[in-house]
């Protein structure tokens, strides 16, 4: 039974029990009896004056096999004083902090229970059999398992001496004597029972060249090597390997070949089996460094998958009798190591893959979100997990069935009582969604413990949220480990000695990036999925919801949360609604993109688990596939100093870090701006990389070739040919690989050039690659098999059901991703298996293909008759004007062909035939060109920057931001209007084309084409609106993100920092880090100049202040001197020089302040900014000369003068009006003459 949201009444007239409306009676002396809660709704939150001494929670006895909390009678009590609703306002800041002796409590629907008590009824759903050593299996529970689905794989080491009580069969004891690695498959049965299958007998191993080992170590038999290895471990620092013996190793002699170079031949190697991954890692890094190790970094899970053909990391398995008809052994509940319903011991021969089953069992998805609040003196500061006073106040959890996508439960954990708004409850009911269960708690520890207990007892297999990896999980885990000293190793699927950890893996745009590893819980952060799949100007959850879901959340600013939280249960319910709706939106995003399907498809293909697929990058995917194939072909892969090791190895602990949401902690970063708003061209120049290989050889290679664009505006059709899967097809066509490469001419001297091998010069060095009939490329085999698999999957989609089609589409997309990773895999100098010669050859061949295509097109179809000879249908697609065909741009795998004298519709129909013709004439299969699109109009600006309209009228934009998040709305709208006019108004298009055909300098001495009048009219109207006194200032608001503390900026001359300090000086609320700061640029007035002087002094005070949070001074400092040493233009005459012209960044102002005070905008700045944005886009019309472009665009705007406000007032008093747009030069001259007389 679950209680739903509602009032405090309880059934049967029982007094309602609620949290955060009071606590207990006043503090009793130590040892006295605690009084019961009053039988009414509590309105005060008692400060227990809890004793600062006391014992930690009871340690678990040696017989207990779990480290999660199953009992607790004392804990650290931290709760906000703002919950003391009857206390005076001055006593409702800060937190209560002490220790409390009682069991943790939870309140729901007027009822009260112990958090850790497990009974027949509970406040949240549970899926568990064992808790705290007690068996809660329902009556009639059948533990039989035949078929089960695996979603996660764990590995750990067991020792025979510690497992004697587990009643293992003899064959399993042999596998762990003296120690052995155990693989645990976690999954679900078709009936919904959670299962853990422990597979014994998997051994990790590595290779060493036998001749080198025998020479260096004087080994005469494999046992001698085992003795040397054991001795090396015993001599290692620390006590970890002190008792290790030669029995921990087995060695055998095998024949293998190094995968590098064609001339390498099979030779004898020692294959050394090691019973511990830690011992293996130490040996590969430290044992006899002069001897190269092979495949020592491969973890036990990968060995288990690759050494058992057909095994998968995500899919259905069947238990069967093994060798000698030996069955799998059910584990007794007393020996369970996980929170599963059933556990089995087996060996690999007890398992068979059920390939025909492709549906998913009833896995559970938890979508969660947390709300936090600072609890110190400044409740608007950004919360930091390491501070005891900064609290998690609410957690929303939405629980879905992953197979049906049904939302089954909504939970809201609340610190303090919470009444969700009736409107929210009605909305959920009207949408057919379950009523929320509100769980209330007296302290943060109780709430967090309840949340983790729920996670343990419910055990969702998949977890999602928005930026949970960078904020929510780190904050919660840091609170539990640092503040409350709670061990987390038992809160995943493992009951103890598991992993539940988050750590940093780097930083991007000042936003930390993290990994999470939880046994039996796959975390898929939708923030990462969205940033990868969708291109948006902002990745805040609200912006994503509007763009992707066409939905919008009810917004609540972080700075409003403290006031709402302190205002009672009803207002806390508003926060709760906000928290729940965030999780609802993320759930919708999850089921729109279905990331688990694509990730699981990649995991199956690559032979790695889903967590590694998410966090370990592209290289690991190709490496495992190559490792599998190399083993089948008799090759071994050299070690690269442990770079293959996975998440299970130790990683440094990490504190919680601020997530990237500006308005509150929680919505993802998404708005990383450059500090300076500049539009630099991406010149796309090739850069040469020089890499050093292990043997001291050097290889340099250029990036992909880009044919310089013929910039301009093209109104004749432009056909774009695209190389299909360019780099994979080059590898296949030319048989490129580690194993087919040779650097020595003598190695291929017995072969025939061109027929048996390819000779190519790369970076000034000759390379040789043998053809497939001599030795087939491993990379080529992988690509061929993958692409054949993808083709077969795609062919099944049209005949599939909608559900099957989605799954198949995700599978083919996963294969495409892995195929495209192969080139990059070879080209990373410090990668898992680098071969820069292969990467350099791929790009060299790609450049040659572009050049060959250009030469062929220019020669083959230079005349229309030549085109007609190849394509007779071209006779019907002739257009007025002279004929020509030339390539105007080539970009890595695309070629732009300008076709004059031909119709666009005809080229669309004939494009594929042209592409096929070029492919047959120039390239080896499977390399082929495809006709990707045909532009009817194309503005080609620079490399990787163009705007065009394809047949059908759709506009395509690449590399050009028409709508930039750090431009104001007015400039974005005007820029878009100009582009639409250029492409969709034929008169303007024709005039622009004529403009682009002539040198830009010519137009400086002659009028612009008349057809551009409409274009100019938009600029004139924009100028009029900018100078209109009735303009809407909101249209001119710019924004920039406060990416870090103002003191951390190297460049202090930034507009948004100016506004930050102005707000600080005015004692207004300053923005938090990651907030986007709005601002406008105002005119330079006396008030602005004085403010700038004061700000300079305030910046100096803030820079010298300790701590991270600035505090406004008690009184504004007086400026040391004015920003000018002479009178301003508004002062009476007599000054000798003009005032200093302020920087644009100094003219930034808070929009609200500007509106309230009537501060005038800097119209010259905004128009210059508009011209600058237009110049970036339209400079291609003027030979990419930005200076000439701006000069010519200004022609549309008559010269005007914008006096300062006080000067303008004196002119108005004298009867003058503005000389706006449209005034003639003579009228302007006469008015200015009279004005000079007036002002003199």
Curated annotation (Swiss-Prot):
Role according to the record: Replicates viral genomic DNA. The replication complex is composed of six viral proteins: the DNA polymerase, processivity factor, primase, primase-associated factor, helicase, and ssDNA-binding protein. Additionally, the polymerase contains an intrinsic ribonuclease H (RNase H) activity that specifically degrades RNA/DNA heteroduplexes or duplex DNA substrates in the 5' to 3' direction. Therefore, it can catalyze the excision of the RNA primers that initiate the synthesis of Okazaki fragments at a replication fork during viral DNA replication.
GO molecular function: DNA binding; DNA-directed DNA polymerase activity; nucleotide binding; RNA-DNA hybrid ribonuclease activity
Protein name, per record: DNA polymerase catalytic subunit
Entry GO CC: host cell nucleus
Subcellular location: Host nucleus
Keyword Nucleotide-binding: no
UniProt xrefs under Gene3D superfamilies: DNA polymerase family B, C-terminal domain, DNA Polymerase, chain B, domain 1, Helix hairpin bin, Palm domain of DNA polymerase, Ribonuclease H-like superfamily/Ribonuclease H
Known catalytic reactions: DNA(n) + a 2'-deoxyribonucleoside 5'-triphosphate = DNA(n+1) + diphosphate; Endonucleolytic cleavage to 5'-phosphomonoester
UniProtKB keywords: DNA replication, DNA-binding, DNA-directed DNA polymerase, Endonuclease, Host nucleus, Hydrolase, Multifunctional enzyme, Nuclease, Nucleotidyltransferase, Transferase, Viral DNA replication
Family to which the UniProt record says this protein belongs: Belongs to the DNA polymerase type-B family.
Skewed-composition ranges (Acidic residues): 669-688
Subunit and interaction comment: Forms a complex with the ssDNA-binding protein UL29, the DNA polymerase processivity factor, and the alkaline exonuclease. Interacts with the putative helicase-primase complex subunit UL8; this interaction may coordinate leading and lagging strand DNA synthesis at the replication fork.
InterPro entries (UniProt xref): DNA-dir_DNA_pol_B, DNA-dir_DNA_pol_B_CS, DNA-dir_DNA_pol_B_exonuc, DNA-dir_DNA_pol_B_multi_dom, DNA/RNA_pol_sf, DNA_pol_B_thumb, DNA_pol_palm_dom_sf, DNA_pol_type-B
UniProt GO BP: DNA-templated DNA replication; viral DNA genome replication
EC number of this enzyme: 2.7.7.7, 3.1.26.4
Region of interest called Disordered, as start-end residue ranges on this chain: 1-44, 646-695, 1103-1139
Biased composition (Low complexity): 1-22
């Amino acid at each position: 039974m679950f209680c739903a949201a509602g009032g405090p009444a309880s059934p049967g007239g029982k007094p309602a029990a609620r949290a955060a409306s009071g606590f207990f009676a006043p503090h009793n002396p130590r040892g006295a009896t605690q009084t019961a809660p009053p039988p009414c709704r509590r309105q005060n939150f008692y400060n227990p004056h809890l004793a600062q001494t006391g014992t930690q929670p009871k340690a678990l006895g040696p017989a207990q096999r779990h480290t999660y909390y199953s009992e607790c009678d004392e804990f650290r009590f931290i709760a906000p004083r703002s919950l003391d609703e009857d206390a005076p306002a001055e006593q409702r800041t800060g937190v209560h902090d002490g220790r409390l002796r009682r069991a943790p409590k939870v309140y729901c629907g007027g009822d009260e229970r112990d958090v850790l008590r497990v009974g027949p009824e509970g406040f949240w759903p549970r899926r568990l059999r064992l808790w705290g050593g007690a068996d809660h299996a329902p009556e009639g529970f059948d533990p039989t398992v035949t078929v089960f689905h695996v979603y996660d794989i764990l590995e750990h080491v067991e020792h025979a001496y510690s497992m004697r009580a587990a009643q293992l069969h003899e064959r399993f004891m042999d596998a762990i004597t003296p120690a052995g690695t155990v693989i645990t498959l976690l999954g679900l049965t078709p009936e919904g029972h959670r299962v853990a299958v422990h597979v014994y007998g998997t051994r990790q191993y590595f290779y060493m060249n036998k001749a080198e080992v025998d020479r260096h170590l004087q080994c005469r038999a494999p046992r001698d090597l085992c003795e040397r290895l054991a001795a090396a471990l015993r001599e290692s620092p620390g006590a970890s390997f002190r008792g290790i013996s030669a029995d921990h190793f087995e060695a055998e002699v095998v024949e293998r070949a190094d995968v590098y170079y064609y001339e390498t031949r099979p030779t004898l190697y020692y294959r050394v089996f090691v019973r511990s991954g830690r011992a293996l890692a130490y040996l590969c890094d430290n044992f006899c460094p002069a001897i190269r190790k092979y495949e020592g970094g491969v973890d036990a899970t990968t060995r288990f998958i690759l050494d058992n053909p057909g095994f998968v990391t995500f899919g259905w398995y069947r238990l069967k009798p093994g060798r000698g008809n030996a069955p799998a052994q059910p584990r007794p509940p007393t020996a369970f190591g996980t929170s599963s319903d059933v556990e089995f011991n087996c060996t690999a021969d007890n398992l068979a893959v059920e390939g025909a089953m492709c549906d998913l069992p009833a896995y559970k998805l938890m979508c969660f979100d947390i709300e936090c609040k600072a609890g110190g003196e400044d409740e608007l500061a950004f919360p930091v997990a390491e501070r005891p006073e900064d609290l998690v106040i609410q957690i929303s959890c939405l629980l879905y069935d992953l197979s049906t996508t049904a939302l089954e439960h909504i939970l809201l954990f609340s610190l303090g009582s919470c009444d969700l708004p009736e409107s929210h409850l009605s909305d959920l009911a009207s949408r057919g969604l379950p009523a929320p269960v509100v769980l209330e708690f007296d302290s943060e520890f109780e709430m967090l413990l309840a949340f983790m207990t729920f996670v343990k007892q419910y055990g969702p297999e998949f977890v999602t949220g928005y930026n949970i990896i960078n904020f929510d999980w780190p904050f919660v885990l840091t609170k539990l480990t640092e503040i409350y000293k709670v061990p987390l190793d038992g809160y995943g699927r493992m009951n103890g000695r598991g992993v539940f950890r988050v750590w940093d893996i780097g930083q991007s745009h000042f936003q930390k990036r993290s990994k999470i590893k939880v046994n039996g819980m796959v975390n898929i952060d939708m923030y990462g999925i969205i940033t990868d799949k969708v291109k948006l100007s902002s990745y805040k959850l609200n912006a994503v919801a509007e763009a992707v879901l066409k939905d919008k959340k009810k917004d609540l600013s972080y700075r409003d949360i403290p006031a709402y939280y302190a205002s009672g249960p009803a207002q806390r319910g508003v926060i709760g609604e906000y928290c729940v709706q965030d999780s609802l939106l993320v759930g919708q995003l999850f089921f729109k993109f279905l990331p688990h399907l694509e990730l699981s498809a990649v995991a199956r293909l690559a032979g790695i688990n889903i967590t590694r697929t998410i966090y370990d990058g592209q290289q690991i995917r190709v490496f495992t596939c190559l490792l599998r194939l190399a083993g089948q072909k008799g090759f071994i892969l050299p070690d690269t100093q442990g770079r293959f090791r996975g998440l299970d190895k130790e990683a440094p602990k990490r504190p919680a870090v601020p997530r990237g949401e500006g308005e509150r902690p929680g919505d993802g970063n998404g708005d990383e701006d450059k500090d300076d708003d500049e539009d630099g061209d991406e010149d796309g120049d090739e850069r040469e990389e020089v890499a050093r290989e292990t043997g001291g050889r050097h290889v340099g290679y250029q990036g992909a070739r880009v044919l310089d664009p013929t910039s301009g505006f093209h109104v004749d059709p432009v056909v774009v040919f695209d190389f299909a899967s360019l780099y994979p097809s080059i590898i296949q066509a030319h048989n490129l690989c580690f194993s087919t490469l040779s650097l020595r001419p003598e190695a291929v001297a017995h072969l025939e050039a061109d027929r048996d091998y390819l000779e190519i010069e790369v970076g000034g060095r000759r390379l040789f690659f043998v053809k497939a009939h001599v030795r087939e490329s491993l990379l080529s085999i992988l690509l061929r098999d993958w692409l054949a698999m993808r083709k077969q999957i795609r062919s099944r989609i049209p005949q599939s059901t909608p559900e099957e089609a989605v799954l198949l589409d995700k599978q083919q997309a996963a294969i495409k991703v892995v195929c495209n990773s192969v080139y990059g895999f070879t080209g990373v100098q410090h990668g898992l298996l680098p071969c820069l010669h292969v990467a350099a050859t791929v790009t060299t061949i790609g450049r040659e293909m572009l050049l060959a295509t250009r030469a062929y097109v220019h020669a083959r179809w230079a005349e229309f008759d030549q085109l007609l000879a190849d394509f007779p249908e071209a006779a019907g697609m002739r257009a007025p004007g002279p004929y020509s065909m030339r390539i105007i741009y080539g970009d890595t795998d695309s070629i732009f062909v300008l076709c004059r004298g031909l119709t666009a519709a005809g080229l669309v129909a004939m494009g594929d035939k042209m592409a096929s013709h070029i492919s047959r004439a120039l390239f080896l299969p499977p390399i082929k060109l495809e006709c990707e699109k045909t532009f009817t109009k194309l503005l080609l600006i620079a490399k990787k920057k163009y705007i065009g309209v394809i047949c059908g009228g759709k506009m395509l934009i690449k590399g050009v931001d028409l709508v930039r998040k750090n431009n104001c709305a007015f400039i974005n709208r005007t820029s878009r209007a100009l582009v639409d006019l250029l492409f969709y108004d034929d008169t303007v298009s024709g005039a622009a084309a004529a403009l682009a055909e002539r040198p830009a300098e010519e137009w400086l001495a002659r009028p612009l084409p008349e057809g551009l009048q409409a274009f100019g009219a938009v600029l004139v109207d924009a100028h009029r609106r900018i100078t209109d006194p009735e303009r809407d200032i909101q249209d001119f608001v710019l924004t920039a993100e406060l990416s870090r503390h103002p003191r951390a900026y190297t460049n202090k001359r930034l507009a948004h920092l100016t506004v930050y300090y102005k707000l600080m000086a005015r004692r207004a609320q300053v923005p938090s880090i990651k907030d986007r700061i709005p601002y406008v640029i105002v005119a330079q007035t006396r008030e602005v100049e004085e403010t700038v002087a004061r700000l300079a002094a305030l910046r100096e005070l803030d820079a010298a202040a300790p701590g991270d949070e600035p505090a406004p001074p008690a009184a504004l400092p007086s400026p040391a001197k004015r920003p000018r040493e002479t009178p301003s233009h508004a002062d009476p005459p007599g000054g000798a020089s003009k005032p200093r012209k302020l920087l644009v960044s100094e003219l930034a102002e808070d929009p609200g302040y500007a509106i309230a005070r009537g501060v005038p905008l800097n119209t010259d700045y905004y128009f210059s900014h508009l011209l600058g944005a237009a110049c970036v886009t339209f400079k291609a019309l003027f030979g990419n000369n930005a200076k000439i472009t701006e000069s010519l665009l200004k022609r549309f705007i008559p010269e005007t003068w914008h006096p300062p406000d006080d000067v303008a007032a004196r002119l108005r008093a004298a009867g003058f009006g503005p000389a706006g747009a449209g005034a003639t030069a003579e009228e302007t001259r006469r008015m200015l003459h009279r004005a000079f007389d007036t002002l003199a």
